[in-house]
Amino acid sequence: MRANYLLLLAATAVQAAPFIKRYENTTAPASQLSTSLADGSTTILGSSSSSVEEDETITSTIVQYVTVTSSDTTYVSATNTLTTTLTTKPTPVITTEAEDDEEDNETITSTILQYVTVTSSDTTYVSATNTLTTTLTTKAAEATESEEEENETITSTILQYVTVTSSDTTYVSATNTITSVLTTKAAVSTNDVSENAKAATTEDDGETTTSTITSIVTITDANGNTEVLTEVAAETSGAEDASYCVPTTVTVTVTAEQTSEVVSTIVHTTQVPLTAEFTLDDTTTTLTSWVDLTSTDLVTITSTSSVYDSYSTGASQSHPISSYSNYTISDYAPPISSYYSL
């Protein structure tokens, strides 16, 4: 498995890039599993008292590949296909000698440990270890002739998360917990083969599928603040309506402030005359010039609005009437106090 990822070493230097691990799972539909179990019950009941059920085969297939993306290059590793096939030999059922004895339950557990190591010229990335555990528990066939078998439950749990560690940084992805529970109704045992076959095909109404996914998302902003969000999505539906979903109602409340402030900038320009007199003997000369004085004021205007509770007319008003209190700014008189001496 490790040799297949050496194709990622084509680049001499790979920067720390997002670590992506994809799973493509192939799952047999619940209807096929239920039919297979029912057919097995039909075969065993139609045989003689010393006949044996057919072999039971469980196949699990996982397709894996890794994609590493740098600034301008994408490296895709080879595709690994992990296939696990388990064949069990059922215990013979002898109806003539063990009519009242119940066989022990049969439990099959399959565990797969997965991790990926990516090595560049100076950095080694090691992912976390994923443990995929599948447990299959089946109720052995009872030896009685008319008693009904108990339900069959299949539970599959997958814990997924990825941790990428470089020389000084550790990246941890969210943790996903995927749990699937499949419960099927066992076929009723009778002496008549035709009656049992009919029950296996018509009385499969106890099938329930439950899927629960828990996701943990960590968000870090530019200031270094970290927020952890947990989202649980669960859906339960019967076999008769696989597309059923529960609607969600979202209520949004908006509250408006009754007081608002507006800041305005006022620029005032005033021309001030400057006069100078020069006297030489009996001659007086007067010089007059104009100087522009500019001042800037910041004015804050506050207005308060309120909605009338009722209106004087009898007609229904589609738009409420608002009352405003206005403030008037007095005429501006620049405080000019200048003294010129020539």
Swiss-Prot record:
It is found in: Cell membrane. It is a lipid-anchor; GPI-anchor. The keyword Cell cycle does not apply. Glycans are attached at N25, N105, N151, N326. It comes from the Eukaryota. This is Predicted GPI-anchored protein 54. A lipid is attached at G314 (GPI-anchor amidated glycine). The keyword Cell wall biogenesis/degradation does not apply. Keywords: Cell membrane, Glycoprotein, GPI-anchor, Lipoprotein, Membrane, Signal. Residues 1-16 form the signal peptide. It comes from Candida albicans (strain SC5314 / ATCC MYA-2876) (Yeast). GO terms for cellular component: plasma membrane; side of membrane. Residues 315-342 form a propeptide. Induction: Expression is induced during infection of reconstituted human oral epithelium. Expression is repressed by HOG1 and regulated by TEC1, EGF1, NTD80, ROB1, BRG1, and SSN6.
